[in-house]
UniProtKB/Swiss-Prot annotation:
S-S bridge residues: none
TM spans (from-to): 10-30, 69-89, 100-120, 142-162
Protein name, entry field: Sigma intracellular receptor 2
Assembly and interaction partners: Homodimer. Interacts with NPC1; the interaction impairs NPC1-mediated cholesterol transport. Interacts with PGRMC1 and LDLR; the interaction increases LDL internalization. Interacts with histatin 1/HTN1; the interaction induces HTN1-stimulating wound healing. Interacts with TSPO.
Subcellular location, principal: endoplasmic reticulum
Length: 176
């Protein structure tokens, strides 16, 4: 596979990432900030199953800082997802470079406190989380495995946009 084939393969991967992120955001993530009545009982039950199965304290009892991240996901990221999916499925859209860099840096930045909380926070009954959350190191790693792709894929996107010669090259504009 040559450079063009590798680039197209990664563009398709990123296209699927952004396309898959739309239903995840709408149906699961935003339950933390949108009115409960917007969601049918089946989706609320699905989220509750996820919270119990993965012991996710951030969605069970979202702290204000986490709600602010969900709000940013609603206002800034969700509108970007279909645009990015289109650009990467179409391929060769150099105009996506700057928005993709902004998205990737923003997302990776939000994941640092999320991952730090899941790895280091006190989930005892005395904490903000009132005993909800992972109890063992294995449970923490299991939960982190859900969140870590949302750090790693934006990191791949960032490196792709910054280092790939195709996206890195600037078109020379003719002087009038």
């Amino acid at each position: 596979m040559g450079t063009l084939g590798a680039r197209r393969g990664l563009e398709w991967f990123l296209g699927f990432y952004f396309l898959s992120h739309i239903p995840i955001t709408l149906l699961m993530d935003l339950q933390g900030v949108l009115p409960r009545d917007l969601y049918p009982v089946e989706l609320r039950n699905l989220q509750q199953w996820y919270i119990e199965e993965f012991k996710d304290p951030l969605l069970q009892t979202p702290p204000a800082w986490f709600k602010s991240f969900l709000f940013c996901e609603l206002v800034f990221q969700l509108p970007f997802f279909p645009i990015a999916a289109y650009a990467f499925f179409k391929g060769g859209c150099k105009w996506i470079r700057t928005p993709a860099i902004i998205y990737s840096v923003h997302t990776m930045t939000t994941l640092i406190p999320i991952l730090s909380t899941l790895l280091l926070d006190d989930f005892s009954k005395a904490s903000h989380f009132r005993g909800q959350g992972p109890k063992t190191f294995q449970e923490r790693l299991f939960l982190i495995s859900v969140y870590i792709p949302y750090f790693l894929i934006p990191l791949i996107l960032l490196l792709f946009m910054v280092r790939n010669p195709y996206y890195k090259s600037e078109e020379k504009r003719k002087k009038k």
